[in-house]
A protein has these predicted regions:
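Serine/threonine-rich, repeat-prone extracellular segments and beta-strand-based repeat modules
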Residues: 17-58, 97-138
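Substrate-binding cleft of extracellular glycoside hydrolase catalytic domains
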Residues: 165-289, 295-297
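Solvent-exposed, low-complexity, repeat-rich "mucin-like" stalks and linkers
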Residues: 1-23, 64-98
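Functionally critical loop-and-helix segments that line ligand-binding/catalytic clefts
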Residues: 145-177, 316-363
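Aromatic-lined carbohydrate-recognition surfaces of secreted/lumenal glycan-active proteins
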Residues: 294, 298-311
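Hydrophobic anchor at the start of a short beta-strand
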Residues: 229, 300-301, 321
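Extracellular interdomain linker/stem segments of modular secreted and single-pass surface proteins
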Residues: 61-69, 137-146
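Short, electropositive alpha-helical surface patch
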Residues: 247-255, 314-323
Length: 363
């Protein structure tokens, strides 16, 4: 056996992970459950060189050694006279602890313009600590509008097709009410190969669900011209039960339409994360609860998120990823099935900006 039988919380480990050598073969090298802290007995069987099956066990200690994450740069700007919501607005989360202790050291006055040198500190229930030095800039309110004459940069759909379309990719878009009335015949003529449509969202944390005002129009028209459809739901779920309920609600909304592509769980409440009382592990399980329910209903599911949050917050799941990373060449090293590459796309059939996506086809 290994000398130190210790497992990090939520790590993927098997029975054999703690065994340096064995006189035989393990019968079932199963994945150990490391979702709870504390001592855990690992029971297993192995067949020795004489063909005799032997029962064995060992004890591991599941521990949390990961410090909280403070989502904060070198400076933070507020307007003079603002209410003191710093501990609400500055994201402070943890892989295990849903409510790490977060506090700010140093003096500041939100009613007085100036720069204040402060330290944001955090400690989780396992005693892991993190801290960040930052400058709080209290600024005078801005007067008047912007005088910028900078020309708006857009991305032409046809150029994306030219640059990224091949035998292994499809080029499409995602839409919601913000795109207004869409001419799907023009989209198809422009080469749009799929569309991911927002089915709806919730009225904030613990709010009621609502159907996107253009959803029915969009899904009917996409079906009518034969553009393959995927779905996304902008979630405010803070519990697994709510995520499951949301998924069942979505299935009811889409049951009369043709949906061939995955249904995406889209959770982006990072600016108000502290109000959700959820750990990163808990948030990942919320997403899994949603996606499991979608899968059980006969649809494919996937997780939507940006590169930064995929790398720092979300834990791995068995579901595909819809990556958001606005760049010509993503350096995201994880696996992904869809890539939302820009939000300033232009295509005939939509009067304003639209997100352009690349789908990677599994052979």
């Amino acid at each position: 056996m290994s000398e130190k039988l210790e497992a990090n919380f939520a790590d993927t480990l098997r029975v054999s992970s703690f065994i340096e050598s064995i006189n035989g073969k393990i019968v079932d090298d199963y994945v150990i459950d490391t979702d709870k802290l504390g001592k855990k007995t690992i029971n297993f069987e192995f067949v020795n060189e004489d063909g005799i099956k032997i029962k064995y066990s060992y004890v591991i200690d599941v521990v949390d050694k990961e410090a909280p994450l403070i989502w904060l740069g070198k400076s933070y700007n507020v307007t003079k006279g603002s209410e003191d919501y710093l501990l609400d607005k500055i994201m402070c989360g943890d892989n295990y602890d849903s409510n790490p202790k977060c506090y700010i050291e140093g003096e500041y006055n939100l009613d007085e313009v100036g720069s204040y040198k402060l330290v944001f500190k955090a400690e989780d229930s396992s005693g892991n600590k993190a801290e960040k030095n930052f400058t709080l800039n209290v600024n005078e309110p801005k007067k008047g509008g912007s005088n910028s004459n900078t020309e708006k940069v857009t991305t032409d759909f046809s150029q994306i097709v030219k640059d990224y379309k091949n035998d292994d990719t499809q080029i499409g878009i995602d839409v919601s009410k913000w795109q207004g009335d869409i001419d799907f015949s023009k989209l198809k003529a422009s080469g749009v190969e799929f569309v991911i449509i927002r089915v709806g969202s919730s009225n904030g944390l613990n709010g009621e669900n609502f159907v996107d005002s253009k959803f029915i129009q969009n899904v009917k028209n996409a079906n009518a011209v034969g553009i393959p459809v995927g779905i996304y739901f902008y979630s405010y779920a803070s519990t697994i039960d709510r995520a499951i309920s949301d998924a069942k609600w979505i299935v009811e909304q889409i049951k009369d339409y043709k949906v061939d592509l995955p249904i995406a769980f889209d959770w982006e409440n990072w600016g108000s994360f502290n109000k959700f009382d959820v750990s990163f592990f808990g948030l990942t399980n919320i997403a899994k609860g949603f996606m499991d329910t979608i899968k059980d209903a006969g649809y494919d599911a996937m997780l939507y998120s940006s590169k930064t949050y995929l790398e720092n917050i979300w834990l791995p799941t068995s579901y595909p990823v819809w990556l958001a990373h606005y760049t010509k060449n993503t350096n995201y090293t994880g696996e992904y099935s869809f890539w939302q590459m820009c939000s300033n796309g232009r295509v005939d059939g939509i009067s304003g900006d639209v997100d352009i996506n690349i789908r990677y086809i599994e052979k």
